[in-house]
């Protein structure tokens, strides 16, 4: 057997092969773990529907141990907020009055660092989300929304 590089002995070649190949195999395997999408991954398109609501519930369960029911619905939110959120196209229950609020929003407020979290989605909730993602706060979730898309991307890191 002749070697192209005369400075590389058979022993060095075998040693390099024995170390290099398994290491490459481990790297190849681990790179698929990093790039593989989760079965629970959601579309990061900037539009909020029931898929995003369910993803948010899973996210709150994962990062805060919220133990939320994953039903894909942000329940009982005051309807006056809906016109400020055209990027929300589903997965929300808007009610004209007597809203009870949502446990999901309570945990979102906790996650965003509110001292006194509530169950109601308000202008301040949007502003906190926008600030969290480094987006200039305008207290709106237009569609498609950079804020919604940033949230969807973060959800996908955890679910």
Please give the residue ranges for each predicted region.
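Cell-envelope/ECM-targeting effectors and their regulatory/trafficking segments
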Residues: 2-159
């Amino acid at each position: 057997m002749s070697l192209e590089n005369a400075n590389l002995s058979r022993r060095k070649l075998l040693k390099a092969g024995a170390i290099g190949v398994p290491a490459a195999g481990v790297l190849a395997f681990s790179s698929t773990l990093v790039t593989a999408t989760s079965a629970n991954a959601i579309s990061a398109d900037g539009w909020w529907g029931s898929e995003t609501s369910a993803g948010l519930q899973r996210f709150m369960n994962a990062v805060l141990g919220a133990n939320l029911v994953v039903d894909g619905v942000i329940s009982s939110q005051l309807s006056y907020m809906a016109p400020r959120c055209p990027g929300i196209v589903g997965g929300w229950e808007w009610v004209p009055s007597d809203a009870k609020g949502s446990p999901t929003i309570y945990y979102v407020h906790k996650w965003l660092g509110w001292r006194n979290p509530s169950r109601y989605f308000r202008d301040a909730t949007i502003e906190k989300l926008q600030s969290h993602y480094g987006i200039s706060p305008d207290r709106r979730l237009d569609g498609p929304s950079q804020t919604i898309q940033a949230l969807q991307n973060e959800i996908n890191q955890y679910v």
